Amino acid sequence: MVTPQHAQELSTGARELGIDLSPAQHEQLLAYLALLIKWNKAYNLTAVRNPDEMVSRHLLDSLSVVPFIEGTRWIDVGSGGGMPGIPMAILFPEGKVALLDSNGKKTRFQTQVKLELKLDNLEVIHSRAESYQPEVPFDGIISRAFSSLEDFTGWTRHMGDVNTRWLAMKGLHPDDELVALPSDFHLDSAHALTVPGCQGQRHLLILRRTA
């Protein structure tokens, strides 16, 4: 269950990240956390079993990329339990966020969150990345610990164009993966992230297509 300590940790952590949550956004994020805790027992949505670790390792980790979000149409590839896409949809109600995952249990959970939190700007897509064909390119494509940079860009290149930004959330800075980037992608910028309550390194890599 969600406790007052979880609520306080979320408020304090968001402020440390420079994010001013509205009361409604704070409530929605905690409602999402409650669903994640409940469904994780049966659906194995995340390897993090301890609810006391979920605020920092899931909610605040997802919120840490908010300052880097530009544009209005985003897709979270390999979304799993909905991170970071669901927190993004809560923070950017005027935008459109798609969650893509090939695991039916995980997309069922995502759909339940969409319904219970009334996230009309959230779309859930049950598909493999390479099989999904968007009607128009996305402004941004994001993944969190999804795959290597080579696979991430290779499986999603058809979802974007030269104006799209690919955001890869990583732990250690993946120097070896950058060497293997496809020739038509380049590293636009890299950012070391500090996530309140999280130990270890966190990095955000922003990639672009050159053609």
From Swiss-Prot:
Per its record, the protein catalyses: guanosine(527) in 16S rRNA + S-adenosyl-L-methionine = N(7)-methylguanosine(527) in 16S rRNA + S-adenosyl-L-homocysteine
Q: So what EC number does this one have?
A: 2.1.1.170
> What's in the keyword line of the UniProt record?
Cytoplasm, Methyltransferase, rRNA processing, S-adenosyl-L-methionine, Transferase
Subcellular location(s) of the protein? Cytoplasm
Q: Tell me one GO molecular function of this protein.
A: rRNA (guanine-N7-)-methyltransferase activity
Query: What does the entry list as the binding residues for S-adenosyl-L-methionine?
Result: 78, 83, 129-130, 144
The cross-references to InterPro entries, in alphabetical order and at most eight, read: rRNA_ssu_MeTfrase_G, SAM-dependent_MTases_sf
| Gene Ontology CC terms | cytosol
Q: Which family does it belong to?
A: Belongs to the methyltransferase superfamily. RNA methyltransferase RsmG family.
Q: What does this protein do?
A: Specifically methylates the N7 position of guanine in position 527 of 16S rRNA.
Q: What is this protein called?
A: Ribosomal RNA small subunit methyltransferase G
What organism does the UniProt record list as the source? Pseudomonas savastanoi pv. phaseolicola (strain 1448A / Race 6)
Gene name in the database record: rsmG
